[in-house]
Amino acid sequence: VQPDAIINMAHGRMGDKMVDYLKAKNILLFAPLTINSLVDEWEKDPMGMAGGFMSQSIVTPEIDGAIRPFALFAHYEDEEGLRHSYAVPERLKTFVSTINNYLNLNTKPNSEKKVAIYYYKGPGQNALTAAGMEVVPSLYNLLVRMKQEGYNISGLPANAEELGKMIQAQGAVFNSYAEGAFNDFMQKGHPELITKDQYESWVKESLRPEKYQEVVDAFGEFPGSYMATNDGKLGIARLQFGNVVLMPQNAAGSGDNSFQVIHGTNMAPPHTYIASYLWMQHGFKADALIHFGTHGSLEFTPRKQVALCSNDWPDRLVGAVPHFYIYSIGNVGEGMMAKRRSYATIQSYLTPPFLESSVRGIYRELMEKIKIYNNSHKENKDQESL
């Protein structure tokens, strides 16, 4: 038997021998979650799962290499008040699509695969950011390697410096007050323009009505006030090279507290944030999603801690797309959140090495003179003692 994937519904580990087998055969391992409560209770629970049940359902399967801790089963009550565990219908549909999408990555030619890569960038001319990484050169190296592996990345510039210039021009992020820069971008930056009909069809496919109402209550009707055109469309910044698209991750909330906006607010994300991910799923039709560097805000959007339901933002924004996250090996805690809340398969990168620092210019000269002075003073004392 040579399976392409294994779906393990048992709790706990499968063991080291099984891990060796999975590695040798390059077999995907999925461990969907069984919720030990009624569907309605679970959907309202902000934790999703906790304690020993979480350990045996999520933590230990991760040791075996299981990915995508996707809540699939929950309890239903019959007419006599007896509980039975069944697959949640809407979850089952998404789970099957997800498995098929992962398997397609093994069979689809690289030249036909569509990949969406999100990066993190401050407003205006701010540089791309990621903890412990030079982002633009690293991103360029990835694109070059993908091109060598047969991916369609037409139009890739000759070097990382040129890529950086293109990102500043076409993949920018704007403050809400930067109207001049925004207007210039809409004319010259080649944004993806999303219409009301497109957006609402994607929303209908991905979000429950009450979930979308949270967005309208917070930010008004589509397109909102940010990145909106005069004719009622929404602009999404992106650079497209053949079948690969690079996109900035927009702010997941509003306000001046950037730490809180990134690390989680209680509000629904704005239209621009949602539209970007829904376009990735339904417009661009990505075969794979990559978040590049540590870290973004997707894994911190509301609501549940783990065992997400179809009413939680990360679950809806990732959809059934295989998700890969280039993440620092030095940030284990938040990396686990990315794995469990945004269904990311983590690809670790090393933290930068520590080097001994030296002082600069005139300060180095000053340090040398202080050292000479101290040594000469010590020599005089030694002579006096003799």
Predicted regions: what they are:
Residues 1-386:
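An N-terminal assembly and electron-transfer interface module characteristic of large anaerobic redox
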